[in-house]
Amino acid sequence: MGEIRSFLLVTIALMMGREIWALENSKCLLEQERLRAQVQQLETRVKQQQARIAQLMHEKEVQLLDKGQEDNFFDLGGKRQYADCSEIYNDGFKQSGFYKIKPHQSQAIFSVYCDMSDGGGWTVIQRRSDGRENFNRCWNDYENGFGNFVQNNGEYWLGNKNINLLTMQGDYTLKIDLTDFEKNSRFAQYKHFKVGDKKSFYELNFGEYSGTAGDSLSGTYHPEMQWWASHQRMKFSTRDRDNDNYKGNCAEEEQSGWWFNRCHSANLNGVYYQGPYTAETDNGVVWYTWHGWWYSLKSVVMKIRPNDFIPNVI
């Protein structure tokens, strides 16, 4: 009888053990299925993220191709502070690109494009190239500067404040490089270029002209027009700060900031049209003595350099 009882107990224990094992095995299988499903979900999410990253990288490449190759930016490591691009050039850095400068009276360092071609040492204060940048800006924008200081040939205005700080350091030459849509190029150069301070409303002053584009700034091309077309000693005007000699607001009509008289024979900050244009006013990128009032130029570079600049050939 005792043997039978022992046999039954062993049998019951074995059966319970099998049931417990089966239950545990079932739980393990369920856990495995759950983990396998989670892994599949994570793999799906990773693939989706990879696809999204690839899409964003493609879009970025398209944008860069559309904007043009990034230009060089040179960090000179703070070895010394340069007042303008001519000092950088004569310190042995001969490659065009963006550099940091700090004019003598400036409280801040700022970026600028240095044109190290054409004799080298040119500080670019304005550039037009493709019409991407809006030049119909308010006084504060023109005072502090705006535009693309990264891309190759990016359009920008260095800022009246910065141009004043540069030109008050000494005697500067302004060179203006102009190109039309027929791939012709001209230039205009002025000695003794200077932009006054804020109290003078950033008044424009310049000296003797030389070049191939004609002297649009002084208005001497036609004595009867000079009194209203000359930009000499004109204050800077914007749509919200009217300092011109016109009964209306030249900056508002021409949709740009500039040293307007009544109104202009040159407006290099004008609306970007492609060559000949029709508008209510002559508000294009205009250099009258080359293409007249009703032709808008393709590209403009305004750049300055000390009059007494002697390039270091080493």
Swiss-Prot record:
Residues 76-308 form the Fibrinogen C-terminal domain. PANTHER family: FIBRINOGEN ALPHA CHAIN, FIBRINOGEN LIKE 1A. One of its GO terms (molecular function) is protein-macromolecule adaptor activity. Homodimer. Interacts (via the Fibrinogen C-terminal domain) with LAG3 (via Ig-like domains 1 and 2). One of its GO terms (cellular component) is fibrinogen complex. Gene3D superfamilies: Gamma Fibrinogen, chain A, domain 1, Gamma-fibrinogen Carboxyl Terminal Fragment, domain 2. Transmembrane segments: none annotated. Pfam families: Fibrinogen_C. Residues 1-22 form the signal peptide. It comes from Mesocricetus auratus (Golden hamster). Keywords: Adaptive immunity, Coiled coil, Disulfide bond, Immunity, Secreted, Signal. Immune suppressive molecule that inhibits antigen-specific T-cell activation by acting as a major ligand of LAG3. Responsible for LAG3 T-cell inhibitory function. Binds LAG3 independently from MHC class II (MHC-II). Secreted by, and promotes growth of, hepatocytes. Its main location: secreted. Disulfide bonds join 85-114, 250-263. One of its GO terms (biological process) is negative regulation of T cell activation. Residues 25-59 form a coiled coil. This is Fibrinogen-like protein 1. It is found in: Secreted.
